[in-house]
UniProtKB/Swiss-Prot annotation:
This is UPF0301 protein BMA1997. Belongs to the UPF0301 (AlgH) family. It holds the Pfam family DUF179. One of its GO terms (cellular component) is cytosol. HAMAP family: UPF0301. PANTHER family: UNCHARACTERIZED PROTEIN YQGE, UPF0301 PROTEIN YQGE. Signal peptide: none annotated.
Length: 192
Protein backbone atom coordinates (compact mmCIF):
# COMPACT_ATOMS: atom_id res chain seq x y z
CA UNK A 1 0.00 0.00 0.00
CA UNK A 2 1.82 3.02 -1.21
CA UNK A 3 -0.56 5.79 -0.25
CA UNK A 4 -2.37 6.37 3.03
CA UNK A 5 -5.62 6.61 1.03
CA UNK A 6 -5.03 2.98 -0.01
CA UNK A 7 -4.89 1.85 3.62
CA UNK A 8 -7.87 -0.13 4.81
CA UNK A 9 -9.64 0.99 7.95
CA UNK A 10 -10.67 -1.85 10.23
CA UNK A 11 -12.44 0.31 12.81
CA UNK A 12 -15.78 -1.27 13.83
CA UNK A 13 -14.61 -4.68 12.62
CA UNK A 14 -14.17 -7.97 14.44
CA UNK A 15 -10.76 -9.60 14.41
CA UNK A 16 -11.19 -13.36 14.66
CA UNK A 17 -8.11 -15.31 15.73
CA UNK A 18 -7.05 -18.00 13.29
CA UNK A 19 -6.18 -21.50 14.59
CA UNK A 20 -2.46 -20.83 14.08
CA UNK A 21 -2.52 -17.87 16.51
CA UNK A 22 0.75 -18.44 18.36
CA UNK A 23 0.04 -15.98 21.17
CA UNK A 24 -2.08 -17.77 23.83
CA UNK A 25 -3.36 -14.36 24.94
CA UNK A 26 -5.34 -14.11 21.71
CA UNK A 27 -5.92 -17.76 20.81
CA UNK A 28 -9.65 -18.32 20.22
CA UNK A 29 -10.55 -14.67 20.64
CA UNK A 30 -12.79 -12.18 18.93
CA UNK A 31 -11.57 -8.58 19.19
CA UNK A 32 -13.79 -5.57 18.51
CA UNK A 33 -11.62 -2.86 16.90
CA UNK A 34 -12.43 0.54 18.38
CA UNK A 35 -9.77 2.41 16.43
CA UNK A 36 -7.50 1.64 13.50
CA UNK A 37 -5.31 4.25 11.87
CA UNK A 38 -1.83 4.74 10.48
CA UNK A 39 -0.67 5.07 14.12
CA UNK A 40 -1.87 1.58 15.08
CA UNK A 41 -4.98 -0.12 16.44
CA UNK A 42 -6.90 -0.48 19.69
CA UNK A 43 -9.45 -3.18 20.38
CA UNK A 44 -11.28 -5.09 23.09
CA UNK A 45 -11.48 -8.87 23.40
CA UNK A 46 -15.21 -9.60 23.67
CA UNK A 47 -15.29 -13.32 24.43
CA UNK A 48 -13.06 -13.83 27.49
CA UNK A 49 -15.10 -13.37 30.68
CA UNK A 50 -13.08 -13.22 33.90
CA UNK A 51 -14.01 -14.50 37.35
CA UNK A 52 -14.81 -10.91 38.37
CA UNK A 53 -18.42 -9.78 38.16
CA UNK A 54 -19.81 -6.24 38.10
CA UNK A 55 -20.78 -6.33 41.77
CA UNK A 56 -17.25 -7.12 42.95
CA UNK A 57 -15.65 -4.64 40.56
CA UNK A 58 -18.02 -1.87 41.59
CA UNK A 59 -17.27 -2.63 45.26
CA UNK A 60 -13.53 -2.30 44.51
CA UNK A 61 -14.04 1.19 43.10
CA UNK A 62 -16.46 2.28 45.85
CA UNK A 63 -19.62 2.28 43.74
CA UNK A 64 -22.85 0.75 44.97
CA UNK A 65 -24.54 -1.36 42.30
CA UNK A 66 -28.05 -2.27 43.37
CA UNK A 67 -29.59 -3.24 40.04
CA UNK A 68 -30.12 -6.97 40.54
CA UNK A 69 -29.86 -8.11 36.89
CA UNK A 70 -26.43 -6.46 36.58
CA UNK A 71 -24.78 -7.83 39.73
CA UNK A 72 -23.42 -11.04 38.26
CA UNK A 73 -22.59 -9.89 34.73
CA UNK A 74 -18.94 -10.79 34.12
CA UNK A 75 -16.16 -8.33 33.54
CA UNK A 76 -14.13 -9.33 30.48
CA UNK A 77 -10.42 -9.60 29.77
CA UNK A 78 -10.10 -6.91 27.11
CA UNK A 79 -6.45 -7.49 26.30
CA UNK A 80 -2.97 -7.41 27.82
CA UNK A 81 -2.50 -3.62 27.81
CA UNK A 82 -3.51 -1.52 30.86
CA UNK A 83 -5.15 -4.49 32.61
CA UNK A 84 -5.97 -2.46 35.72
CA UNK A 85 -7.99 0.03 33.68
CA UNK A 86 -11.64 -0.39 32.73
CA UNK A 87 -12.95 0.02 29.19
CA UNK A 88 -16.70 0.14 28.59
CA UNK A 89 -17.96 -0.66 25.11
CA UNK A 90 -21.55 0.51 24.87
CA UNK A 91 -24.34 1.84 22.74
CA UNK A 92 -24.63 5.64 22.81
CA UNK A 93 -26.89 7.11 25.48
CA UNK A 94 -28.86 10.07 24.19
CA UNK A 95 -28.13 13.28 26.07
CA UNK A 96 -25.11 11.95 27.93
CA UNK A 97 -21.53 13.02 27.51
CA UNK A 98 -19.07 10.95 29.51
CA UNK A 99 -15.72 12.47 30.44
CA UNK A 100 -13.61 10.13 28.37
CA UNK A 101 -15.58 8.64 25.49
CA UNK A 102 -14.65 7.81 21.96
CA UNK A 103 -17.33 7.34 19.34
CA UNK A 104 -16.41 4.37 17.22
CA UNK A 105 -17.06 4.82 13.53
CA UNK A 106 -20.25 2.83 13.03
CA UNK A 107 -22.15 3.73 16.15
CA UNK A 108 -20.77 2.24 19.38
CA UNK A 109 -18.83 4.16 22.00
CA UNK A 110 -15.90 3.23 24.20
CA UNK A 111 -15.65 5.02 27.52
CA UNK A 112 -12.83 4.85 30.04
CA UNK A 113 -14.03 7.30 32.69
CA UNK A 114 -15.70 6.31 35.96
CA UNK A 115 -18.77 8.45 35.22
CA UNK A 116 -20.15 5.82 32.85
CA UNK A 117 -19.98 3.25 35.67
CA UNK A 118 -21.66 5.70 38.04
CA UNK A 119 -24.45 6.04 35.47
CA UNK A 120 -24.73 2.24 35.15
CA UNK A 121 -24.94 1.94 38.96
CA UNK A 122 -27.88 4.35 39.09
CA UNK A 123 -29.67 2.93 36.07
CA UNK A 124 -29.10 5.99 33.88
CA UNK A 125 -26.20 4.59 31.88
CA UNK A 126 -26.10 2.50 28.74
CA UNK A 127 -28.47 -0.46 28.78
CA UNK A 128 -26.24 -2.57 26.54
CA UNK A 129 -22.57 -2.55 27.45
CA UNK A 130 -19.53 -4.75 27.88
CA UNK A 131 -16.94 -3.89 30.54
CA UNK A 132 -13.37 -5.06 30.09
CA UNK A 133 -10.19 -4.76 32.07
CA UNK A 134 -7.39 -4.00 29.66
CA UNK A 135 -7.32 -3.65 25.91
CA UNK A 136 -5.45 -4.99 22.92
CA UNK A 137 -3.09 -2.64 21.12
CA UNK A 138 -0.96 -2.75 18.00
CA UNK A 139 1.71 -0.33 16.83
CA UNK A 140 1.81 1.19 13.35
CA UNK A 141 1.65 -1.59 10.75
CA UNK A 142 1.73 -4.39 13.35
CA UNK A 143 -1.88 -5.52 12.93
CA UNK A 144 -1.65 -5.40 9.13
CA UNK A 145 1.42 -7.64 9.32
CA UNK A 146 -0.37 -10.14 11.60
CA UNK A 147 -3.32 -10.23 9.18
CA UNK A 148 -1.02 -10.76 6.18
CA UNK A 149 0.57 -13.72 8.03
CA UNK A 150 -2.84 -15.38 8.41
CA UNK A 151 -3.18 -14.50 12.12
CA UNK A 152 -6.62 -12.91 11.92
CA UNK A 153 -9.80 -12.89 9.88
CA UNK A 154 -11.76 -9.64 9.71
CA UNK A 155 -15.46 -8.99 9.31
CA UNK A 156 -17.79 -6.04 9.91
CA UNK A 157 -18.83 -6.06 13.57
CA UNK A 158 -22.38 -6.84 14.61
CA UNK A 159 -23.44 -5.31 17.96
CA UNK A 160 -25.80 -8.25 18.54
CA UNK A 161 -22.76 -10.51 18.89
CA UNK A 162 -21.16 -8.12 21.38
CA UNK A 163 -24.25 -7.56 23.53
CA UNK A 164 -26.78 -10.34 22.91
CA UNK A 165 -24.76 -13.49 22.21
CA UNK A 166 -23.41 -15.55 25.13
CA UNK A 167 -19.62 -15.18 25.47
CA UNK A 168 -18.92 -18.83 24.67
CA UNK A 169 -20.81 -18.51 21.36
CA UNK A 170 -19.25 -15.25 20.12
CA UNK A 171 -16.32 -16.86 18.31
CA UNK A 172 -18.54 -19.11 16.19
CA UNK A 173 -21.10 -16.31 15.73
CA UNK A 174 -18.41 -13.96 14.41
CA UNK A 175 -17.17 -16.67 12.04
CA UNK A 176 -20.77 -17.16 10.94
CA UNK A 177 -20.77 -13.59 9.64
CA UNK A 178 -18.21 -14.84 7.10
CA UNK A 179 -20.24 -17.95 6.33
CA UNK A 180 -17.72 -20.31 7.93
CA UNK A 181 -17.31 -22.30 11.14
CA UNK A 182 -14.19 -23.13 13.13
CA UNK A 183 -14.21 -26.69 11.74
CA UNK A 184 -13.60 -25.20 8.27
CA UNK A 185 -10.49 -23.23 9.28
CA UNK A 186 -6.90 -24.25 8.77
CA UNK A 187 -3.88 -22.68 10.33
CA UNK A 188 -2.02 -22.91 7.04
CA UNK A 189 -2.15 -20.14 4.46
CA UNK A 190 -2.71 -21.29 0.89
CA UNK A 191 0.00 -20.82 -1.70
CA UNK A 192 -0.35 -21.14 -5.47
Amino acid sequence: MSKSSDRINLTNQFLIAMPNMADPTFSGTVVYLCDHSERGALGLVINRPTDIDLESLFNRIDLKLEIEPLLHIPVYFGGPVQTERGFVLHEPVEGSAYNSSMTVEGGLEMTTSKDVLEAVATGTGPKRFLLTLGHAGWGAGQLEEEISKNGWLTVAADPRIVFDTPAEERFEAALGLLGVSSSMLSGEAGHA
